[in-house]
Amino acid sequence: LEALGEIGVHLSCAPTLQWAEWRKAAWNASMNAPLALAGLTNGALLEQPELHDTFIRLLNETVLIARAEGVDLDPNGQLQEQIESSIRATARNLNSMAAALAQGRPTEIDWINGAIVRRAAHHGISVPENQRLVNAVRARSLHGPR
């Protein structure tokens, strides 16, 4: 890792595999479904207040469930800024769920937000924003591309 750092490649190791999986889930769960339903690229999350509010609620619910699972995703309080930095870097990208909805293909909603809903139920915790988006994406999927 040191040699890579000397040439400008900076890597870090995740504390655990479970932490890395939850971190990826936080990224996907907080942005894929709202952008898919809106049919917009990643940057819209930072440009449109309503989408940004949804992003924050989804992120907070995901962090809560990860914590219930024994994983502290945001020990230094910087998770939101780190994800927003990634959003800025990929602002023009259309996520896979948005592409799937637009093309009438199955989405990964049950494996992303649906998984958070299931883990929340296991812990007796309500995640209304995740549940709302699971329902909305499923409903949109039934009606095909718009």
Q: Where do the model's predicted regions map?
A:
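NAD(P)-dependent Rossmann-like dehydrogenase/reductase catalytic/cofactor-binding core
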Residues: 5, 53-146
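Internal alpha-helical scaffold of NAD(P)-dependent oxidoreductase catalytic cores
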Residues: 1-75
